Curated annotation (Swiss-Prot):
<keyword id="KW-0963">Cytoplasm</keyword>
<keyword id="KW-0819">tRNA processing</keyword>
<dbReference type="InterPro" id="IPR016009">
    <property type="entry name" value="tRNA_MeTrfase_TRMD/TRM10"/>
</dbReference>
<comment type="subunit">
    <text>Homodimer.</text>
</comment>
<dbReference type="InterPro" id="IPR002649">
    <property type="entry name" value="tRNA_m1G_MeTrfase_TrmD"/>
</dbReference>
<dbReference type="GO" id="GO:0005829">
    <property type="term" value="C:cytosol"/>
</dbReference>
<dbReference type="InterPro" id="IPR029026">
    <property type="entry name" value="tRNA_m1G_MTases_N"/>
</dbReference>
<keyword id="KW-0808">Transferase</keyword>
<comment type="similarity">
    <text>Belongs to the RNA methyltransferase TrmD family.</text>
</comment>
<dbReference type="InterPro" id="IPR023148">
    <property type="entry name" value="tRNA_m1G_MeTrfase_C_sf"/>
</dbReference>
<dbReference type="Pfam" id="PF01746">
    <property type="entry name" value="tRNA_m1G_MT"/>
</dbReference>
<dbReference type="InterPro" id="IPR029028">
    <property type="entry name" value="Alpha/beta_knot_MTases"/>
</dbReference>
<protein>
    <recommendedName>
        <fullName>tRNA (guanine-N(1)-)-methyltransferase</fullName>
        <ecNumber>2.1.1.228</ecNumber>
    </recommendedName>
</protein>
<feature type="binding site">
    <location>
        <begin position="131"/>
        <end position="136"/>
    </location>
    <ligand>
        <name>S-adenosyl-L-methionine</name>
    </ligand>
</feature>
<comment type="function">
    <text>Specifically methylates guanosine-37 in various tRNAs.</text>
</comment>
<dbReference type="GO" id="GO:0052906">
    <property type="term" value="F:tRNA (guanine(37)-N1)-methyltransferase activity"/>
</dbReference>
<dbReference type="GO" id="GO:0002939">
    <property type="term" value="P:tRNA N1-guanine methylation"/>
</dbReference>
Length: 245
């Protein structure tokens, strides 16, 4: 996969994208990363990338020319996903990360200031994505967050493919509780089932914990999850236990 970032602050990406999984993905030729400062594509001697909005209003708007010019220098095809980071976009999710992990080429347009000239949105962009109902100073942090979520899903990046399959949201539920040594710490012990060596019982316990954890922390996900009769019985027993205290 190749990822290009159009940004006014390319140095922001240096630390995040050159460590841990991102670094290994690049070293193993699973990922190619390129940052482009679209200020270099401004059309006047002052390298101006923003201007006042037509019709009046507060703030500055990113001009179309630098972004369009920068895009012309990229190897963009009809299959390239061009992503605009903006509050009005589709909320980012694990499902969206899975979809984007199958792309060969992604371009993130990371804006600043009040917003973008609408012609950028309507003529260059394939996806508008939001990280939530709040506003950030620029698109760089959301782009880096999305990159991490996407790249770890590329086959061969994590090494152990089971790793991301056990993650929260991978099957619509939150992840089960995890434990490691020591077996007992400050009077707190690891559940016996995890030490039993019985993998069927361990899998059943983990699924039960995922259901209960999701029910407690993200009831909206439980409403969407295709509960089996066995799942419903697990949750019903849990609810009865809560009432009994």
């Amino acid at each position: 996969m190749k990822i290009d970032y159009l940004t006014l602050f390319p140095e922001m990406f240096d630390g995040v994208l050159n460590h841990s999984i991102m670094k290994r993905a690049q070293e193993n030729n699973k990922l190619q990363i390129n940052t482009v400062n679209f200020r270099d594509y401004a059309i006047n001697k002052h390298n101006q990338v923003d201007d006042y909005p037509y019709g009046g209003g507060q703030g500055m708007v990113l001009k179309p020319e630098p972004v369009f010019n920068a895009m012309e220098d990229l190897d963009v095809t009809e299959q390239t996903r061009v992503i605009l980071m903006c509050p009005q976009g589709e909320p980012f999710s694990h499902q969206k990360a899975v979809e984007l992990s199958k792309a060969d080429h992604i371009v993130f347009i990371c804006g600043h200031y009040e917003g973008y000239d609408e012609r950028i949105r309507t003529h260059l962009v394939t996806d508008e994505i939001s990280m939530g109902d709040y506003v950030l100073t620029g698109g760089e942090l959301p782009a880096m967050t999305m990159t991490d979520a996407i790249v770890r899903l590329i086959p061969g990046v994590l090494g152990n493919e089971q790793s991301h399959q056990d993650d929260s949201f991978s099957d619509g539920l939150l992840e089960f509780p995890q434990y490691t040594r020591p077996r007992e710490f400050k009077g707190l012990t690891v559940p016996d089932v995890l030490l039993s060596g019985n993998h069927a019982n361990i899998d059943a316990w983990r699924h039960e914990q995922k259901l209960i954890r999701t029910y407690n922390k993200r009831p909206d996900l439980i409403e969407k999850y295709p509960l089996t009769n066995a799942d419903k019985q697990i949750l019903e027993r849990y609810k009865i236990g809560l009432k009994k205290g």
